[in-house]
Amino acid sequence: MNTNNKNDFKSVYVSSRARDNILKYKYTGCDSSFISIHIMNHFWNWFVNLFPRSFAPNLITLFGFISIIVSYFVTLYYMDRMNGVAPKWLYLFNALCIFIYQTMDACDGKQARRVQASSGLGELFDHGCDAMITYLVMQTFQSSLQVGVNQISFFTTLWIMYVFFMAQLEQYSTGVMNLGHFGPTESQFSMMAGHIFTFFYGEQFWFNTIKFESFEIQYNHLVLLVVILGGVGTILLNTFSILKNGNESILTNIINLVPISILLGVSIYWGKYSTVNIFETAPHYFMGIFGILFALVTGKLILARICMDKLSPIQLIMLPLIAVILNIYKFNGELFDEILFTKVYFFVVFIVYIHFAYDVVTSLTKVLDIYCFTLKNKKQT
C-alpha cells in the first residue's frame, strides 16, 4: 500500500493527525545502566546476530512476550493463590523466562537497526508489550516470594505499573526515554534473583523475619517495601525531569495522569470494600481487570507520544467502574451480583484491549507501508 493513501481507512484509535505525525517520529533514548552498557550489551550484540536478517524485529518482541505469558499461566496453575509449595523447577523456569524476555527485549531494537526496519510501530509494539508484561512478571515474582493474593500484592503490582506509566509520561513530555542507572535490566535481574532464591532456599525462606529495633518484618514484605519505595524514588525523578525538561504544560501532564490515577484509586477502594471479598471469590478476574486497564491506558499514552497526539482523560471502558463504586458504597452490593459483574467486565476489558492492539497495529502498518511480523521486500515498496 502506498503511504499517500494512508487516510483511506478508518481507525478507532489512530487519528488522522496521528497518521501524519508517526511518519516523522524518531526515537531518542538514554541508558545509563552499568550492567546494560558494560556487561549485557556484549552478549546482546552477539545474540542478535543469531537471527537471520529476514527475521522481523516485532517477531523477536513477540517471542519475549510469549515467554512471560507462559511463565504466568504455568505459575497460576501451580500457585493460584500466589503462595504455597510448587515444583522446584518452576522457580528456575520463571527466572529463565524473564531472561528470555530480557534478551528478546534488548535484541528487537538491535535487529531493527541491523536490518534498517526501525519504526514507530516497532517501539509501540515493544513498549505496549512491556506494559502488559509488567503485570504478569510482578504476579509471578510475588508468587515466588509467597506474598499471596491480597491487597499488598495487588497494590504492589499496580504501583509498579504506575511507575512504568510515569516513565512513559516523562518520555511523552521530554521526548527522551531515560532508563537511568537502575532501570529495566536491574529490575529484571532482581526478579530472577528472587525466583532463584526460592529454588535454593525454599518457600519458607521468605517467612523469616528481620528486626529493626522494635520493628519486625518478613523477608518477602521487606522486598516489597524496597520495591515500593524504589518506585516512589523513580516517580520523583520522572516528575523532576518533566518539570525541568518537559515540552508539555503542567496541565497537560496532570490531565494525562487522570485515567491511570483513577484506576489506582478505584482498584484500592474496590479491593478493600468489596461486599463479596473479591480477593477470595474472583481474585484473578478482579486483578486482571486492572492489569489490562493499566496496560491499555499506558498503551494509549505510548501511541499518543509516538504519534505526537493527545491522551483523552475520559476512557469509556472505565465507566462501568462507577457502577461498582455505587453498588458497594450506596447499595451494599445489592444492586447487582458483584462476582458475575467482575467476570463479565474482565472479558469485556480483555476484548477491548485485543481490539485496541489489533486496530493500532493494522492501522500503523498501512500508514508506514510495512508488515508487523515479516519484513517487506524493498523491491515491493
UniProtKB/Swiss-Prot annotation:
Protein location: Membrane
Segments crossing the lipid bilayer: 59-79, 84-104, 147-167, 190-210, 222-242, 250-270, 284-304, 311-331, 344-364
Recorded superkingdom: Eukaryota
CC terms in the record's Gene Ontology section: membrane
InterPro entries xref list: CDP-OH_P_trans (IPR000462), CDP-OH_PTrfase_TM_dom (IPR043130), CDP_ALCOHOL_P_TRANSF_CS (IPR048254), CHOPT (IPR014472)
Membrane topology category: Multi-pass membrane protein
Keyword entries, A-Z: Membrane, Transferase, Transmembrane, Transmembrane helix
A GO term for molecular function: phosphotransferase activity, for other substituted phosphate groups
GO process terms (BP): phospholipid biosynthetic process
Family: Belongs to the CDP-alcohol phosphatidyltransferase class-I family.
Protein's UniProt name: Uncharacterized CDP-alcohol phosphatidyltransferase class-I family protein 1
Originating organism: Dictyostelium discoideum
